């Protein structure tokens, strides 16, 4: 590589790092705007302990933590939905919402759209309730651990192997 290539590569690194820093700084600025609007720095906010942080500390396994995080993300989306008509904090909420969804779904748009579709389902709608009850067995089966199926397949393969060797 010649000097020009090194200089261009260095400039690209500087640009990417500074834009990442800028995005991060903008993100923190938007959170500070929300803290100011909701008066979240007031000492009485600490009454009763943290809302989510203790719960997050209790869960170590990635799959378990993801379940808890999905509920927390859902909470924030509902919170932002309640204030969607507030022009003072709209930009801050939109910025944080986009960043939160991007991070939570690892930039997967299909997972994101499915998640958003799920949290928009109206629980009080009779037709929705009927459909949900109709699908309950399949959902419960999907929630069941796969270990029994894996053990059964393993024992079947082991049995077949013994029979073939005789």
Swiss-Prot record:
- Subcellular location(s) per record: Secreted
Q: What does the entry give for GO biological process?
A: adaptive immune response; defense response to virus; humoral immune response; positive regulation of autophagy
Glycan-bearing residues: 39, 106
Which Pfam families has this protein been placed in?
IFN-gamma
The Pyrrolidone carboxylic acid modification is found at 24
Tell me a GO cellular component. extracellular space
Give the residue range of the signal peptide: 1-23
What the protein does? Type II interferon produced by immune cells such as T-cells and NK cells that plays crucial roles in antimicrobial, antiviral, and antitumor responses by activating effector immune cells and enhancing antigen presentation. Primarily signals through the JAK-STAT pathway after interaction with its receptor IFNGR1 to affect gene regulation. Upon IFNG binding, IFNGR1 intracellular domain opens out to allow association of downstream signaling components JAK2, JAK1 and STAT1, leading to STAT1 activation, nuclear translocation and transcription of IFNG-regulated genes.
Summarize the subunit comment: Homodimer. Interacts with IFNGR1 (via extracellular domain); this interaction promotes IFNGR1 dimerization.
Identification of the protein by name? Interferon gamma
Please report the organism this UniProt entry assigns to the protein.
Ailuropoda melanoleuca (Giant panda)
């Amino acid at each position: 590589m010649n000097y020009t290539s090194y200089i261009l590569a260095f400039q690209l690194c500087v640009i990417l790092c500074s834009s990442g820093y800028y995005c991060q700084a903008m993100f923190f600025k938007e959170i500070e705007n929300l803290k100011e609007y909701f008066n979240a720095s007031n000492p009485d906010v600490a009454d009763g302990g943290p809302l989510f942080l203790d719960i997050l500390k209790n869960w170590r396994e990635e799959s378990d933590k993801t379940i808890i995080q999905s509920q927390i993300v859902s909470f924030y989306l509902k919170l932002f939905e309640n204030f969607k008509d507030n022009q003072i904090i709209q930009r801050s909420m939109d910025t944080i919402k986009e960043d939160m969804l991007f991070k939570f779904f690892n930039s997967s748009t299909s997972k994101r759209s499915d998640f958003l579709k799920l949290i928009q389902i109206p629980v009080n709608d009779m037709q929705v309730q009927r459909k949900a009850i109709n699908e309950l067995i399949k959902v419960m089966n999907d929630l069941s651990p796969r270990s029994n199926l894996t053990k059964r397949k393993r024992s079947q393969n082991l049995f077949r192997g013994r029979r073939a060797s005789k």
